[in-house]
């Protein structure tokens, strides 16, 4: 792996071109993971608390899993841990998740069919560095963070990151191995390559 990230101007240019080509060709869907849980809207805040406690032993990421809310099989919103902080414990059994949910549209999202370069830009604009991935019908299918994007790019380069390094990247919410993906996309934008790519995708 270290050999791929060599030194020298020609080596650096070829690496950048390889990254750019992958960011254009790879799509969000296959790169996504599923960093969200699901609760029904009529479940109590106690259920949310218990869910967090059960996951405390293995959730070591900088950003905990999102909690999406359903009603009768329909996605209707999401809920944060803020109600657990704002309300006394005795109210957790009286109030439901649905009473404190927020619109699903508030979460930054991207379609499965979008190219990865769009994900790189969207992640920079998102508050927490995570995106909700949606299918053609606009329904949630997964999530995407920087480590997901980085892992997909490394696979495209036929490089496999050791699990401990990938987990460390996920905990920090950054690109594994310091992949300069934002710089690659910025260069593509400056050269006008993204305009040409967008036109070819819509034609």
Spans of model-derived segments:
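Membrane-interfacial segments at transmembrane helix termini in multi-pass membrane proteins
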Residues: 1-42, 157-187, 192
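Bateman (tandem CBS) regulatory domains
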Residues: 24-37, 46-47, 93-107
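Nucleotide phosphate-binding site architecture
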Residues: 8, 29, 85-86, 150
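Short hydrophobic beta-strand motif reused across regulatory alpha/beta modules
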Residues: 76-82, 141-150
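Structured interaction and signal-relay segments at domain junctions
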Residues: 81-90
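Helical hairpin unit composed of two closely spaced alpha helices linked by a short loop
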Residues: 73-79, 94-97
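The conserved cystathionine-beta-synthase
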Residues: 38-64, 69-71, 88, 108-136, ...
């Amino acid at each position: 792996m270290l050999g791929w990230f060599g030194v020298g101007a020609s080596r650096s240019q070829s690496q950048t071109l390889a990254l750019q080509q992958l960011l254009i060709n790879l799509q969000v869907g296959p790169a996504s993971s599923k960093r969200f849980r699901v609760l029904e809207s009529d479940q109590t805040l106690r259920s949310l608390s218990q869910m967090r406690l059960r996951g405390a032993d293995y959730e070591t990421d900088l950003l905990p899993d999102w909690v999406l809310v359903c009603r009768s099989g329909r996605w209707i919103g999401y809920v944060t841990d803020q109600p657990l902080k704002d309300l006394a414990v005795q109210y957790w059994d009286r109030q439901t998740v649905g009473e404190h949910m927020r619109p699903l549209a508030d979460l930054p999202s991207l379609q499965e069919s979008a190219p990865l370069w769009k994900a790189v830009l969207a992640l920079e604009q998102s508050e927490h560095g995570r995106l909700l991935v949606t299918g053609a019908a606009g329904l949630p299918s997964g999530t995407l963070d920087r480590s997901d994007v980085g892992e997909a790019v490394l696979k495209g380069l036929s490089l496999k990151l050791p699990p401990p390094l990938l987990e460390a990247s996920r905990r920090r919410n950054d690109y594994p191995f310091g992949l300069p993906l934002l710089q690659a996309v910025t260069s593509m934008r400056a050269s006008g390559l993204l305009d040409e790519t967008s036109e070819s995708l819509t034609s």
